[in-house]
Amino acid sequence: MIIEEAQAINSFFRSESSKEVYGLIWLLVPILTLVLGITIGVLVIVWLERKISAGIQRRIGPEYAGPLGILQALADGVKLLFKEDLLPSRGDIRLFSVGPSIAVVSILLSYSVIPFGHHLVLTDLSIGVSLWIAISSIAPIGLLMSGYGSNNKYSFSGGLRAAAQSISYEIPLTPCVLSISLLSNSSSTVDIVEAQSKYGFWGWNLWRQPIGFIVFIISSLAECERLPFDLPEAEEELVAGYQTEYSGIKFGLFYVASYLNLLVSSLFVTILYLGGWNLSIPYIPITELFEKNQTSEVFGTTISLLITLAKAYLFLFIPISTRWTLPRMRMDQLLNLGWKSLLPIALGNLLLTTSSQLVSL
C-alpha cells in the first residue's frame, strides 16, 4: 500500500515537472521566433541600404555574397564575430563591456509591444507606447557608459553627444505619441491600429496628425542617429565617437543597435500613423475579411504581417535617402532644432488635439 502511494506521488510530481518544462518551452517559442524575425529584418535593412545607396551613387553595391548580395551583411557579421576583442588598458572594463549590451537589449525590449499583424504581438499592454518611450531612453545610458569606459576623449565626447541628442529629441517625441493616444482613447498599440481601421486609407492618423507626423519623423531620425543627426559618431570630428575603442563583436553590436532602432522607429511610424496591419480599403478591416475559419485566420494573420512589413520597409526609403542628400548639422543647430522648434510645435499640436477632443465630447 505504501509503495503504491509512493509511486502515485512520484508520478504526480513527474507530471507536474513535465508541465512546467512544456510551459517554459511554449513561453520561449514566441520570444525566439521574434528574435529570429528581427535578425532577418535587420539583415534585409542592411542590404536595402547598401543597394539604395549604391543606386543613388550610380554603383552596383553588394552582389557576390548570395543572390543579389543579400548575404553580405551576414558575412560581415561573421567576420566581426571572429575578430579580436581588444580592451583599453586604462579604461573601465566593466562599463566598456556592458555598454553595447545595454544599448542592444533596451532596443530589443521595444519589440515586445509592437503588433506585427492581427494577433501577432508578444504583449498587448495598455501602456504600450508609453513603455516604448520609457525603454528607448535607456539606450543612451549604454552609449554614455561606453564613451566613459573607453577612457578616450573622442569616445567620451561622442557619449555625451548621444545623451544630449537623445534627451533633446525624446521630449518632442512624447507629445506626438500622447496626441495619438488621445485620438485613439488608448495607449495600447493594438487599440491604436484598430482605431484607424474603419475608413481605410483615409482613417490613418497621418491625415489627422500631419504636424505630429513630421515632428515624429524628425525626432525618430535623431533618436536613430541617422544623417543629418549622426553627431555622436561624426567621423571628421570624433573619429568614430563612442565606438572608437571598440573592435570585434562589441563593435558589431553598435551597428546592430543602430539598425534595430531604425526598424523600431519605422514600425512605430507604421503603427501610429499609417494604419498598421490594416488594408487601405475603407470599411473592410482585415480582421473581418479573414475570420470564417481557422485556415482563413492564419491566412489573414500572414497577410496582415506582410502589410505591416511592406509599410515599414517603404518608409525606410526616407532615412536611407536623407543619408546621401542632407549635410550634417552642427551641435548647436541640432539642439536649437530640438528645443526651440520641435518642442514648441509638438506641444502646440498636443494642445490642439486635446482641445478638439474636449470639443467633440
Curated annotation (Swiss-Prot):
GO biological process terms, semicolon-separated: aerobic respiration; photosynthesis, light reaction
One Gene Ontology CC term in the entry: chloroplast thylakoid membrane
Record bears the keyword Translocase: yes
Keywords of the record: Chloroplast, Membrane, NAD, NADP, Plastid, Plastoquinone, Quinone, Thylakoid, Translocase, Transmembrane, Transmembrane helix
Listed InterPro entries: NADH_UbQ_OxRdtase_su1/FPO, NADH_UbQ_OxRdtase_su1_CS
EC number(s) on file: 7.1.1.-
Membrane-topology annotation of the record: Multi-pass membrane protein
Catalysed conversion reaction: a plastoquinone + NADH + (n+1) H(+)(in) = a plastoquinol + NAD(+) + n H(+)(out); a plastoquinone + NADPH + (n+1) H(+)(in) = a plastoquinol + NADP(+) + n H(+)(out)
Membrane-crossing segments per the record: 25-45, 102-122, 125-145, 251-271, 298-318, 334-354
GO molecular function: NADH dehydrogenase activity; oxidoreductase activity, acting on NAD(P)H, quinone or similar compound as acceptor; quinone binding
Domain of life: Eukaryota
Compartments, record wording: Plastid, Chloroplast thylakoid membrane
Pfam families tied to this protein: NADHdh
Subunit (UniProt): NDH is composed of at least 16 different subunits, 5 of which are encoded in the nucleus.
HAMAP family listed in its UniProt record: NDH1_NuoH
PANTHER family in the record: NADH DEHYDROGENASE SUBUNIT 1 (PTHR11432), NADH-UBIQUINONE OXIDOREDUCTASE CHAIN 1 (PTHR11432:SF3)
Family indicated by similarity: Belongs to the complex I subunit 1 family.
NCBIfam families (alphabetical): PRK06076.1-2
Function recorded in the entry: NDH shuttles electrons from NAD(P)H:plastoquinone, via FMN and iron-sulfur (Fe-S) centers, to quinones in the photosynthetic chain and possibly in a chloroplast respiratory chain. The immediate electron acceptor for the enzyme in this species is believed to be plastoquinone. Couples the redox reaction to proton translocation, and thus conserves the redox energy in a proton gradient.
Entry protein name: NAD(P)H-quinone oxidoreductase subunit 1, chloroplastic
Species of provenance: Nuphar advena
Taxonomy of the source species: Eukaryota, Viridiplantae, Streptophyta, Embryophyta, Tracheophyta
Designated gene of the protein: ndhA
